[in-house]
Amino acid sequence: MSPPDRAAEGGITRAVPPVSRPAWYALERGGWRDYVTLLHPPYTAWHLSYVVIGGCLAPVGAWERLAPVGAWGRLGAATAAFALAVGVGAHALDELNGRPLRTKIPDRVLVGLASVSVLGACAIGVVGAVTFEAWLALLIPIGLFLVLAYNLELAGGRFHSDVWFGLAWGGFPVLCGYAAVAGDVRGVTVLAAVFAVLLSLAQRALSSHVRHVRRRVSAVRGELELTDARREPLDARRLTAPAEAGLRLLSLATVVLAATMIAFRI
């Protein structure tokens, strides 16, 4: 974005439009680009990393008991389930509910994507419960509830809050990843889930500010007066750049942490 125009006299900074894209990772609208944007790629990778982290925290005994192929298979299945439920299903429902990403994807396509992906995730869960541990079936309705309640803002949006975001997309993936490999839940699972919840809350704090500026602010005006009497123009990019840089780095760091834990297990 170019710097804001200044009046010929008085040094008054005119209002300038904010950044045009609804999200820092959003592509130009139309065609296949809408579907890429719909996936929220950096955030989806971030939250899938929680599943991997949880699975890799399972005790050595669980990995030995299942044999490496079996353990990796279960962790892969859990990750695939979350990729469907969160990466596709939840985001399709979110876009259906108010078009926050401003895509041109038809409503019927969004409904189809959400239905097929969420049902696919549930099917993976059922297979896991039948072939591994029956109690894992309890996680299926919990996950289904979280996807629907959060993204459709059920109960007047009561579940569409910072805390529920941290629990649903931070703590729950860690728990499921661990349970998929270990077949149970232990103290270390709770600690890792707390880590994921707190990190997700940090994500939410940064992303909420960015969303507000990108999607709700129509113009920005003003300037910063520095201690040395210099003045710098204030625009939307200055308001969002620090938070977006933090989000980029945190998403990358979480993916690298998950990759590190995979390498450790290998």
Give, region by region, the residue ranges found by the protein language model:
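Helix-coil boundary and interhelical linker segments in multi-pass alpha-helical membrane proteins
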Residues: 52-80, 122-139, 173-192, 262-266
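Cytosolic, membrane-interface loops and tails of multi-pass inner-membrane proteins
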Residues: 13-33, 89-106, 203-241
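Membrane-interface module
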Residues: 182-266
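Alpha-helical transmembrane segments and their membrane-interface exit regions
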Residues: 83-90, 142-152, 194-204
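N-terminal transmembrane signal-anchor/hairpin module of polytopic inner-membrane proteins
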Residues: 3, 11-38, 43-44, 71, ...
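Multi-pass membrane catalytic core of lipid/isoprenoid biosynthesis enzymes
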Residues: 33-38, 42-55, 74-81, 87-136, ...
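Transmembrane helix-loop junctions in multipass membrane proteins, especially transporters and channels
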Residues: 59-63, 94, 98-102, 133, ...
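Intramembrane alpha-helical segments
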Residues: 107-181
